[in-house]
């Protein structure tokens, strides 16, 4: 502002100076400042310009006067111009001086401003070095980071929404394509039927044309017959006429002879009369007969004049007689001819009728023969349909096996971080095969409908037949009965076939179980998270969208068994809704619970407090994370059936070979394979058959016979009642924990405690069945022998055949992992068992009761079992979670898992020590240190090195490096850096060094790791809950076309995916 004011002042001064100079100029001109003398002096000073001009022009005085006047006038103007130019130059100089002054002023002002800025900067530097300034900057940065996070969250939510809609569109396209395939098949079948109908119409048309031609021929024959009749009638008439003429001639000849006799007597009399009579005779003969005329002429010529009168008289008489006779004869002949014609017509009509009847009978016979041939063809076709149906039943079995595979893929829902795309791939495969199944059933139904129509047509045709014929009636009844029997057989085979019904029930029950598990998980997850309500996040709440499929069924999912196709669509949409609304890939709730040490390390002092803890935590803390997965999923009837089945199988396995102490007996078969048969407490029987295949039979709680061939396929053996108990029966443990009365019984009865503690371990150690080292962890007697009898331990670990055979079966581990999903749903049960473990470690009295109930002599043995069995469980699950993303390469990590299990057992023993009393610490330290220092170090140092060096170095050379690198990346991304790094270091480093390092770690480091992971997991939960806040913003940004999509299972018939 100061600079602008100074500029204005300088401008005003310049204007004032210009005004003054113009005023001076005007005053000088008015006063006549430029005189002649001054002009002359000025001219001399310039150079005498005017004098030279005057000298040249002195001759004419008059002219001189005139010139002087002009020169004076011109010189004044010139001087004024020069003066004006001088003033202009002076103005310019003044203006330049003023500009220089302005520039100097600007320089001064800039110097002042620079000084002030330097002072301000110095003050700012002092302030920036202060803490308050840094705090403000940090707050601003945090706000910016939060804004960026909100922005990225909005973008990710938009992307997730769009992904879901893209997946839905993809599914709709798949459904559309599948429907188009079905429609094309139906269209082709309709085309074929139409072609068949056209062929039949053409045949009928040909047959009709033939009939028309035959009718035309018949009409022609009729006409020909009529013509023949007419011709015959004419011929008969002519013959009759000829006969009459002959008879007349004979009579005339007789009469002529008589006349000749009379003429001889009366020859000469009455000549005139004779002449006149002769003329009359000639006329009469001309009228009646031409032949008579000729004869009369001859007679007239022969007769004499004398006999003319007699002759004339005779002729008159004869003529009269002849006329009478002719009339009579003609009448008789007419009557006779009419009678003959009528009789002939009747005869011909009878012949025609006979011919027509014969023709129709021939046609009826031909039609009957054609019908019999058609019926024979139909019977053959029905037989073919029955054979085709047997083939279709085999196809049904294959398709339902594919359905079972799809159901097993549904088991992996909780296994791959919430991604469900791989399940939908398997579902789509099973659906396509199910479509082929349904199309075959539709073909059978179509054929049955065709048969029905044919039966109706046959009945209609039989109505027109002659019912008096017994053969036709018998044929009709036989054929109709056979057709009805075949129809009934087809219907019953389609609807009431036990094989297909059982297979359908398998698929249906399995799907129901898994969907119930999913439903209960989501329901608990929603109800126990107040901030996170998945129902409120459904886009376009009023219309049918994802979760309408879930919540409309509630706990009892009501789907008809016959509509498997719609049921598959329901499963697919259910999984997609889970994939969209469940936590993102960064948050894995199972890992969060497993690695959250604050939950695992809870200890309780008294028996009563443990009850209260179980009841509280069962309802509050564990429910917050959605781990009461299978609360009300089973009925009491199913539990009772399971218990009966368990008792039956426990009696069957009591007859298995045992030694005196009830330990496991190793039996070698003829091929040298090991047959490991465990006691009733171990609940595991591993048998190798002659082919080297593993047969895993689980007894008390599993009720599964997992028969694994070399290809790694699973066969779930079923009870005869048709219900799948594989997935239902492991849930008994959960319901035992659910009811408070059962909890009290569990805590009071030590025998039940052992079973409950052991069974979860058995469920998860199915994954590691091929490893003898993990089986050692399960079997109580063998655990003690390892820890106290070094010679036996060395013999067990030095059996190279078992380990080598285990490592050489690649598909066993993968196929056993498929069993994981049947048991991972029991996590809540296992989590609630962990505080019991702590309680059991503390109570020596209960451990003594346990020893008495199991009939084992050594007290220290069961102390080690009570420590090791539950502790090993948690880390086997951790190893399972580490190897999730590398399903195919798990065989390469078997040895690593064995070693990490052995190391982590010691680590967890130390984790539980700070919570125990001093006496118990002394007992555990005395027992475990001696055992570990004397026995297990020797075993690990000598035997496992040899096994790993000889057998598994080749396997673990290249693959494990890649696997470890992949595991580290994946686990670091999943917010479990500290735990994963420790585990990976344990895998990659030497095993003996790890024992020392893990035992020397203090408890505080592990506790710090746990708290850091708690904060990270809570941050991820809060991040997930923030989606509810941003939902309104998302709803405004998403286009309406995506929001208004409806999902109806009736319109759509199916899945796919990456």
Swiss-Prot record:
Possible candidate for an effective malaria vaccine as determined by epitope response in sera. Residues 515-544, 872-905 form a coiled coil. Keywords: Coiled coil, Merozoite, Repeat. Transmembrane segments: none annotated. Residues 1-34, 641-665, 706-728 are annotated as: Disordered. It comes from the Eukaryota. Residues 11-34, 641-661 have a biased composition (Basic and acidic residues). The keyword Coiled coil applies. Residues 1-10 have a biased composition (Basic residues). This is Leucine-rich repeat and coiled-coil domain-containing protein PF3D7_0703800. It comes from Plasmodium falciparum (isolate 3D7).
